[in-house]
Amino acid sequence: MKKFIYIVISFLLVSCSSNALKKTIILSKASPNYVNWLMDSNFSIVNAYDCNNIDSILLLADGIVLTGGEDINPLMYGDSSNLLLCEAMDFRRDTIEKKLFDFALSKQIPFVGICRGMQMMNVAHGGTLYGDIPTELGDSVVHRNNGEVMHDILVTCKNYDYVSMIFPQLSI
């Protein structure tokens, strides 16, 4: 899984730029895992969560990763009823990630969201979330898998050159 995430992030950044100089990746909130995945590459890593002035780092960004983590505050998607369902929330992080997402969209900077990061992209773009899937949907949707997390996926793409760059062993 770590290798896959590294490949996806590397692919997004390499495919969107022809410049071979060291790229600056902004992580919304760094953890040792994210730093380790990117450390051996030609990336300079900036942890946005540790910055006092987000505006000062935005112009450095060659790519942005909205990382995984705690629940997004339901007030960000207009649902005060979910406040009691959500676990730990971090309003500062929510604000930072929304700003990073908006900046990436406006400047057409490559970005990727991992778990919570994908949820933040949805919320920042006006979407909503289920505060707690088992509470809101019951047991009809299996949300947690304590076993194997790998599974087959169907890839459909009009430009197979990009797919073959990520998965060279794939036969089409």
Spell out what each predicted region is:
Residues 172:
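Active-site oxyanion/phosphate-handling segment shared across diverse enzymes
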Residues 5-9:
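Sec-dependent signal peptide hydrophobic core
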Residues 2-4, 15-114, 122-130, 134-169:
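N-terminal beta1-alpha1 cap of cysteine-dependent amidohydrolase-like domains
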Residues 117:
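Conserved SAM-binding loop
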